[in-house]
């Protein structure tokens, strides 16, 4: 019966009906989410982005995606979204800002997961002939970790980033010709180790634990290793415990870019 009704409807009317139904469905869905999650879901899931990267940058993005898909299969984007075009565009703007000196960029990433963002940013730096050292801090726990209870959706989730994830990430780096130093420790311990060794960086991406005091601790320690005029990227800045850090950056640093997922700042 429904099929016959659809066939009898003019195409324009049917399209309008589907748009209206989708709108009502999305409104109901949003009302069912915690208030802290509604804007994030709207921007990250419901919003369509028409982003076209420059050919050179799109080539880097698709190369990383193809390599990740070959290693991880259908789960290549697990717990990431780093290669979504609108997010990749933010990374491009960040890399362009830090590459202005035409000197090798020393890059530190806290929380590398499957290696997508590390590979993309490293590829963009290499394409601009400013690739320096690449360092990743990630504990890669045996059985993963639990996150989300204090997040926007107020729902704890078992995150399957394990020792096997590290092995696969290293395969990805090798396939892309990237030499990544992995510090397999919690972010606080890894950052203190870098401070003790007088290591400094031009670009730092904070993508560790987003809950409780972890974002504040990571941010404070990162300021000790960020070089003058260095650039810092905040991940998942719409999470409740990351928002105060973003407010500080908005007030005291120079914003380079902001997406629904990341925000980048230069510290003078």
Regions found by a protein language model. Name each.
Residues 2-268:
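A short alpha-helical cap/connector motif
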